[in-house]
Amino acid sequence: MSSNTSSVMSSPRVEKRSFSSTLKSFFTNPNKKRPSSKKVFSSNLSYANHLEESDVEDTLHVNKRKRVSGTSQHSDSLTQNNNNAPIIIYGTENTERPPLLPILPIQRLRLLREKQRVRNMRELGLIQSTEFPSITSSVILGSQSKSDEGGSYLCTSSTPSPIKNGSCTRQLAGKSGEDTNVGLPILKSLKNRSNRKRFHSQSKGTVWSANFEYDLSEYDAIQKKDNKDKEGNAGGDQKTSENRNNIKSSISNGNLATGPNLTSEIEDLRADINSNRLSNPQKNLLLKGPASTVAKTAPIQESFVPNSERSGTPTLKKNIEPKKDKESIVLPTVGFDFIKDNETPSKKTSPKATSSAGAVFKSSVEMGKTDKSTKTAEAPTLSFNFSQKANKTKAVDNTVPSTTLFNFGGKSDTVTSASQPFKFGKTSEKSENHTESDAPPKSTAPIFSFGKQEENGDEGDDENEPKRKRRLPVSEDTNTKPLFDFGKTGDQKETKKGESEKDASGKPSFVFGASDKQAEGTPLFTFGKKADVTSNIDSSAQFTFGKAATAKETHTKPSETPATIVKKPTFTFGQSTSENKISEGSAKPTFSFSKSEEERKSSPISNEAAKPSFSFPGKPVDVQAPTDDKTLKPTFSFTEPAQKDSSVVSEPKKPSFTFASSKTSQPKPLFSFGKSDAAKEPPGSNTSFSFTKPPANETDKRPTPPSFTFGGSTTNNTTTTSTKPSFSFGAPESMKSTASTAAANTEKLSNGFSFTKFNHNKEKSNSPTSFFDGSASSTPIPVLGKPTDATGNTTSKSAFSFGTANTNGTNASANSTSFSFNAPATGNGTTTTSNTSGTNIAGTFNVGKPDQSIASGNTNGAGSAFGFSSSGTAATGAASNQSSFNFGNNGAGGLNPFTSATSSTNANAGLFNKPPSTNAQNVNVPSAFNFTGNNSTPGGGSVFNMNGNTNANTVFAGSNNQPHQSQTPSFNTNSSFTPSTVPNINFSGLNGGITNTATNALRPSDIFGANAASGSNSNVTNPSSIFGGAGGVPTTSFGQPQSAPNQMGMGTNNGMSMGGGVMANRKIARMRHSKR
């Protein structure tokens, strides 16, 4: 190797070249005389002849040889001739820049990987000599380390390559045959692929899941494997077994001071490092459970009874478990206190694992053998009976022991005479005869009953019956029904009828089940089927949610009925049948949610029974009861209430909110959303908001009509004091007014806004008409409709009248419409103006034709200010003011300033009209805007008269009628764009201010630049000096250029001249485009 390396290293160092020029040197023709080709490639190479045929495969082959030349892939040794060594030297003397080589991306990647590998080797110190850093490790390391696998890092790369991998191990032809078998070593890295393949079988990681870490199915296989290993090791370790036994004993004692043996764990861990093995005590604890569970438990003697049981306090019986196999009991793997079976406040004695769910949670009360001489009743203990029959012997004593408060299962017949307060299960029926009638009532029935009581018809001896089927005594004075009954109780037979009259027992307040018969008390809240009431002193359920059965009468006499009034179910949610009740003092359900049937009442106490305040479903049947003033109707009736008899003297309380059709006996609801039947309504019972069509009311009282009526109401025989709806959107029929005509003279308000057609009625009523709807009785003048004159004296006209008003009324002080867009018909009376009203106002904006019936005595009647039609002639009105802006023919009562009608003597001339010329001298105001040629009087002329005005005061007269003025055309010589010495404004024929008709009148020529020689006042400032005009020369704005140098004309010397000057000397900017 020394000779080879010295030959390479002793070669002269060439200058650095680019990488592409180095690649080009591989593709040069070897026949050419180039030093680089002579050095690198020689004719004795086996693949030198292929370079002349420049096909694709040879190019790829050369690139491959170039890439693997320095990566120790070939097994040829370096020869003495440097030409035979395919070594990539990044630096030649070739100065020509090679063309771009079509190298594949994968080839470029592999070249970069090769450079990276050399750089990593240099950093790791694997390359000993850094004199020639371009020479790869195949030259330096030599052949002392050979590869065992014969492969290379690049050949075994998983990167796809277009070059076959067989070329990696191809040998090159060398001179010495003994060096052909020399292979280049493989460079070792920190993460070698071969080393990773070697440890794949040993370092397989465990698959983690969401399960618990200790999976029993996993450790069963491990345990079998360990047993085989233990059988192979015959001797074993005695210390390990002793330690495990000590651990077991410590676990059973509740002491975990000693840990598992580490030597056994190391042996177990040798098999698999990643297996997280458990020790044998841990596996026994997981598989077999705690030692206290497996160990025998001494059976509790029957004679051993705790003192707490004798005292009556609730206790829990410890379960007796038989001896079982070790492997039979497997407890769950997750637990907090499963090692020692100690009772803690949060953990009691663990029950049997193989027992059923009912047996696990069953805890019954053991009734101890108490002293027979003791007669005191025990306190009720908390017991939960989940349908489990405890076979207990009956105590023969007559004491009254405590019972369970909550009964969730079948009823356990104990020796107690009181039923369970809370019944959640199926309780048996009370069918046995209670022999001891003199027993004191010291216990109560279950308050909550959630089960179905069993019907037990046999009345055998209690000795032969189990505890669950023992019945309670039937004495009603000592037993009460459960407050909450959630089940269906069976028929409860009563044998002691004499005892049923002693004490009043309350029925269950809340009955959630369907009971057939109820012997003692009616529940307050009944959610099921109501049982038959067998006691006359029992109160009905206040809240009934189910269907109550018919109540049976007891055999007691009515005289024995207590006078106490028991309430009926206040809230009835079910359908109750007819109850033959003796104790009629029971109250009716206040909230009735169901359809109640007939309730036969035969007692005078039933007068205090209250009707259901809230009745939701169907229509109840008529209650046959003597009507009383204290009988309450449902306040909120969501159904159709029953019809009361006609014997009701006073008015009952009716529902305020009725959502269904009600009968005639009820008052009209405040909000009626349905169709109500025709009924006799008391006063003040009409609906305020009626969304339907109310029936015809035949009452002679004064009902209040709805304020807002959205529908069409039928005819109502209402009185004069009935208030009409303020806002009426429909078209109600005319209501018949039954009042006298004298009441119509009162002050009556008309509708503010009426958008419909009113009926032509002459009836007098104080009822105002509807707002959006035709009135029924009285028709004041509408706002936006066609009014009909009422016969009343105080009917006011509407402010905005868009229709044609009928003037056949005789109202005295009626005000005309301010904005009347119609032509009112002529009336025969004093409709528009009255004899008595001196402040009558005529139509201000009367677009239509106003009335011609102006009163003769009216002196202050104002005419229409903006009358756009021909108004009627006034009768004898001398100074009546007519419309100021009347564009039609004005009446004789006064002239409209905007009319061209014939004016009277003292009337104003029309403002925009053409009044005929009169000889009168007392014309007040001249026609201000007379466009039709007014022959003016000496009093004043038209201001804007454009046709033939002879008045001197007319400023903008179109033509001049005076003979001494010269009729100069307006736009002849004084046109705008011609040079002139006179102004261009000629409105009144003044001829440019030359002829001045008025001495002191300011002429327009003085204002708009006339010269001083025009005859104007000399002391007036000449505007021509202000606006640039010379003395005596007017300013010509856009005419020909004048001689004055300061004129703003369009001359040749001005800046604004288009011929030359600034604009002529200005160059035009051009867009210069650069050549592209």
From Swiss-Prot:
Instruction: Give the domain of life.
Output: Eukaryota
Region Interaction with KAP95, annotated ranges = 1040-1076
Annotated GO MF terms? nuclear localization sequence binding; structural constituent of nuclear pore
Write out the biased-composition intervals (Low complexity): 1-11, 708-723, 965-979
As for PTM, the annotation reads: Phosphorylated by CDC28.
Residue stretches of each FG repeat? 1008-1009, 1027-1028, 1038-1039
Q: Where is this region: Disordered?
A: 1-39, 143-183, 224-260, 403-518, 548-743, 940-979, 1025-1054
Residues modified as Phosphothreonine: 381
Record field: compositional bias (Basic and acidic residues): 426-439, 488-505
The role this protein plays is:
Functions as a component of the nuclear pore complex (NPC). NPC components, collectively referred to as nucleoporins (NUPs), can play the role of both NPC structural components and of docking or interaction partners for transiently associated nuclear transport factors. Active directional transport is assured by both, a Phe-Gly (FG) repeat affinity gradient for these transport factors across the NPC and a transport cofactor concentration gradient across the nuclear envelope (GSP1 and GSP2 GTPases associated predominantly with GTP in the nucleus, with GDP in the cytoplasm).
Comment field (misc): Present with 468 molecules/cell in log phase SD medium.
The record's comment about this protein's domains reads: Contains FG repeats. FG repeats are interaction sites for karyopherins (importins, exportins) and form probably an affinity gradient, guiding the transport proteins unidirectionally with their cargo through the NPC. FG repeat regions are highly flexible and lack ordered secondary structure. The overall conservation of FG repeats regarding exact sequence, spacing, and repeat unit length is limited.
Q: What is this protein called?
A: Nucleoporin NUP1
